[in-house]
Amino acid sequence: ETEFDYGTPDGYRFFMDLGAAANAKKYFGDDVPTYTDFMNHGTYDAYWKARNVPQHLKNVKHPVLIVGGWHDAEDFAGVFHMFRGLEKLSPGNDTHMVVGPWDHGGWGRNVGDIFWGIQYGTNTGEDFRSQVELPFFRQHLKDGPPANLPKALMFETGGNKWRRCDAWPPAGSTPTKNLPGAGGNLSIGAPAPASAAGASSAPAYDALPP
């Protein structure tokens, strides 16, 4: 049940018309805990530091399957922070990580063969649920056969294939920086010089439309 009339079915329009963040108080008051927390703690202060989950993952002694998507706009980094926290603070635990070509929660509801026009060749979402998630739960909840999962199962979007890794980052890998350059170019190591007349490397942002 809606507690107040937004005045529009378009949530984006509601917040664009709202104006300053302080104006939201007349709608939300103190009844939305998460919103209140954000307003009361606008920086990474002691309140948020105490609630940073990875630091508390000590002595975990049960199987863990961490799942994320390369296209997750809400909390992509959290997957890797959780995995690193478990590997560091509970190194002997049965921990696995899976990252596929999905958006936020897409591994649980989508076919997974396409994302915004990008074809992946297989039904990655359905394959995950039937070949990874189900065997994992069967093994640990129903004493089924081993799920045979690697430490990290990662989908390579450029090659449209799954990679089984004994560690993450993989042993022998070298971190590189992908840097945006002028004219919409992307380079590895150092940004490419502008080649087109009038090309700009300054990012453009317009809240309306974003």
Q: Where are the regions a protein language model picked out?
A:
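Accessory cap/linker subdomain of secreted extracellular hydrolases
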Residues: 1-59, 145
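Short glycine-rich catalytic loops that host catalytic nucleophiles or stabilize transition states
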Residues: 68, 97-102, 156-158
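Acidic catalytic loop of the alpha/beta-hydrolase fold
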Residues: 71-75
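Active-site-adjacent alpha-helix of alpha/beta-hydrolase-fold enzymes
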Residues: 76-95
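Histidine-bearing beta->alpha loop at or near hydrolase active sites
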Residues: 97-107, 111-117
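C-terminal, loop-rich substrate-recognition/catalytic regions characterized by aromatic stacking residues
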Residues: 114-210
